[in-house]
């Protein structure tokens, strides 16, 4: 299927309206205004559409970013039509985005995602070979779309160097680091079969971490947990938030997500 997917830049009002329709279908919430997207496209932004036999099945919307003297492409939104998810369409779009961003003169792309969405973590870190060093608690405030409602909108900031330079520091050592890594907190299955973190574990945010690598479990089906056990979803959010913030503050970065089984994946901190 992927060989038939065409990813191209979108610029016309008609193309943008098509993107907004798909955005509404995916998130069931307010869409980015046309005038804002047009303004972004004409000022360093980039909108890509993935088409299968002339049907828009995915898109990516990014705008120019500039912080602390550094310019980059900020990839604000990646959306894939439900029936085409987990087929590699998102990865295809992101690689095309990286290629065009380089042609536009960008050296880096950044974006955010919910770290408890492990499948997104697998795409971002393991497939795309990005890294993250920053945790953003309740980044967007309260969100009411089906994916984000009922919990703080925590995010981690992903960085993707166009020339892959930073990642090369870890790339050849990933397997070795995974073998050596210490698991920060244990997990188990609840009586109804949902993954849960150790109830008796108290994380000390004042402890100094000295190992070369650590592993942090995250659920593979966080949306299911949110529906079936909101209190368990909250537990995952607040416990992992503290761990992320502590390790990032001590200079660690997330560079990989390992899928060990159907219940959890493990972020690799180095």
Regions found by a protein language model. Give the residues of each.
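Short loop segments at secondary-structure junctions
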Residues: 53-54, 83, 161-166
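Conserved active-site alpha-helix within GNAT-family acetyltransferase domains
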Residues: 115-134, 143-146
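A conserved beta-strand-loop-helix scaffold within acyl/acetyltransferase catalytic domains
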Residues: 3-82, 136, 259-260
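Residue-level recognition of the GNAT/N-acetyltransferase active site
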Residues: 81-83, 114, 219
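Intrinsically disordered, low-complexity, positively biased terminal segments
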Residues: 104, 132-270
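Conserved GNAT acetyl-CoA-binding A-motif
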Residues: 101-114
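Conserved acetyl-CoA-binding loop-helix of GNAT-fold acetyltransferases
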Residues: 80, 86-101, 120, 236-239
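A conserved beta-turn-beta hairpin within the catalytic core of GNAT-like acetyltransferases
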Residues: 65-75, 85, 107, 209-216
């Amino acid at each position: 299927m992927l060989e038939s997917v065409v990813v191209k830049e979108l610029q016309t009002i008609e193309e943008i309206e098509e993107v907004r329709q798909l955005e509404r279908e995916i998130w069931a919430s307010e869409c980015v205004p046309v005038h804002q997207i047009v303004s972004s496209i004409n000022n360093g932004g980039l909108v890509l559409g993935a088409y299968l036999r002339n049907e828009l099945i995915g898109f990516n919307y990014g705008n120019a970013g500039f912080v602390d003297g550094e310019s980059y492409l900020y990839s604000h939104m990646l959306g894939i039509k439900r029936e085409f998810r987990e087929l590699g369409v998102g990865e295809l779009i992101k690689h095309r985005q990286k290629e065009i961003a380089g042609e536009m003169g960008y050296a880096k792309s950044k974006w955010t995602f919910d770290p408890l969405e492990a499948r997104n973590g697998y795409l971002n870190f393991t497939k795309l070979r990005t890294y993250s060093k920053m945790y953003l608690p309740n980044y967007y405030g309260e969100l009411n779309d089906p994916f984000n409602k009922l919990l703080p909108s925590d995010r981690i900031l992903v960085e993707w160097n166009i020339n892959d330079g930073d990642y090369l520091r870890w790339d050849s050592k990933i397997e070795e680091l995974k073998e050596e890594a210490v698991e920060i907190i244990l997990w188990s299955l609840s009586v109804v079969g949902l993954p849960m973190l150790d109830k008796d574990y108290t994380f000390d945010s004042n402890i100094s971490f000295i190992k070369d690598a650590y592993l942090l479990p995250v659920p593979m089906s966080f949306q299911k947990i949110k529906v079936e056990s909101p209190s368990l979803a909250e537990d995952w959010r607040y416990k992992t938030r503290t761990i992320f913030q502590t390790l990032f503050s001590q200079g660690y970065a997330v560079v990989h997500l390992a899928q060990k089984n159907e219940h959890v994946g493990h972020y690799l901190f180095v």
